[in-house]
Amino acid sequence: MIGKLFEFLEVDAETRASALVLSDLLTPHFEDIIERFYSKVQAFDISPHVTDQAIEMLKQKHKRHSSALFHSQFQEEYFASIRRIGIRHRDVALSPKWYVAGYMKLKLAFIEVIIRSDYSIVTKGQLVKTLEKYIAIDMALALSTYDAVIVD
């Protein structure tokens, strides 16, 4: 299944190399971007589970996940992590619409960093394409757990 998704999104060696460049560019901005994201989530009172207590833990987990995503070789550790994330979002009854909207907010902030970088327009285009592909994979896998049946 995942191979077909990669093929459909045309994730190749160039995309993976671009993801590492993207990681180097975005990582210094994760703190600020994630801080602003959770401030927005709290302001909109999207979930009762996003309390002041939970925020610090969520920020740290989000930074680790973002970094892991762009460095991912898409091995079992990544798949297990994204399944846990999706299941947790489902278990706290986070609507898929808020999951997608939230990821869009993050994506737009990441794109702002790309746009403001010193890279050439061609490289910026490649970085945005890579960002889109990696976020599509991440969202698709997380959201697929919403319908998954868990058997103990």
Language model region names:
Residues M1-A17:
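Charged, compositionally biased N-terminal leader segments and the immediate start
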Residues T15, F44-S47, S120-I121:
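Short, structured coil/loop segments at alpha-helix boundaries
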Residues T15-A17, I82, D118:
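Short linear motifs at secondary-structure transitions and domain/linker junctions
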